[in-house]
Amino acid sequence: MEQLKKNKERLKIITDSIEQGIKDLFESDKYKQYLRTMSRFHRYSVNNTLLIAMQRPDATHIAGFSNWKNQFGRHVRKGERGIQIIAPTPYKKKIDAVKVDPDTKAPILDQNGNAVMEEVEIKIPMFRVVSVFDVSQTEGRPLPEIVSDLTGDVQQYDTFMEALQRSSPVPVSIEPIALTTDGYFSLTEQSITIRAGMSEVQTMCAAVHEIAHAKLHNYVIANAEAEQTQEITKKDQRTKEVEAESIAYAVCQYYGIETAENSFGYIAGWSKGKDLEELRASLETINQTASELIDNIDRHFMQLCKEHGMENALKNAEMSLEDDYDMIDGIINNGQKNVEEKLTEHRPSVLQQLQTTNNSEYKRTALKCAERER
């Protein structure tokens, strides 16, 4: 009981720090740092992403004390302070429940018409505060090197763009349009148009931005899918731009694409007057959409590599750390992975994996994406 009380107290302290962190987050520099952290840990929950950004914003690879030692041959340096995050620690409990027919799902009754009871085991959700450490806090066996610059030839760019197009909910085309915009999502046409003639990186940035709009702000599809009694609440233009630009920034950061210096200077004005739940909801939307888009791009990219006979590039690529709860000491996941609270390790993107197989002479740093005018 004493341990349970201590855990509740630690959870209360860390939850309070999260709430204060959200309030303080919407200053341009802090917000950009949060998005950079989110890009490295895009499957983490908003809470844990924020906790990492607050405690060690430059973290890249995280694991528990024992896992660093046992799985990676590394040890945490003496005196290093752990990063506190929230981890799920569900426990099982047996209870009496009404027995139901496995086919009809109706309660089974005895000869007197009373419900038959049976003992069943249920899982009770619970969370606790755990400490993890970044690779920079450890010493020992080297981890596989991750290439961070966007490099490669035109074939790689074309493959990536095709993966991006397959990840879009609407068709994407590249056409000559006015120089005043990099691209746009059309509600009436249900399509995305990107301006022709831009650099490869600028084209990718614009495409991600507009795909974010198509995924989040497509009210034609939303109204069609909603029940007649439901009313779709449309977001204001500033909120839509904050969400799309944040997603584009995080996704591009994940793939090592150097975007234009976006100060997010407008973020403080946008967040002013919004309550904590509104701000948290926007962060959840940005987090979930960016994570889904990254996963879809990776999946389509790997499929295209197979179609193009590039299996060896993927086969030879080394993943840096495993992608599940096992990186956290004492966590039992029972094969279950909760999307919202998943504490996964950062892994090299499929684009980064291919970089080591391309011509080194062709290596270049990413071009800066011109700041979007809207």
Language-model-derived ranges and their functions:
Residues 344-373:
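Short acidic, low-complexity intrinsically disordered linear motifs used
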Residues 333-337, 347:
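Long, low-complexity, intrinsically disordered extramembrane tails
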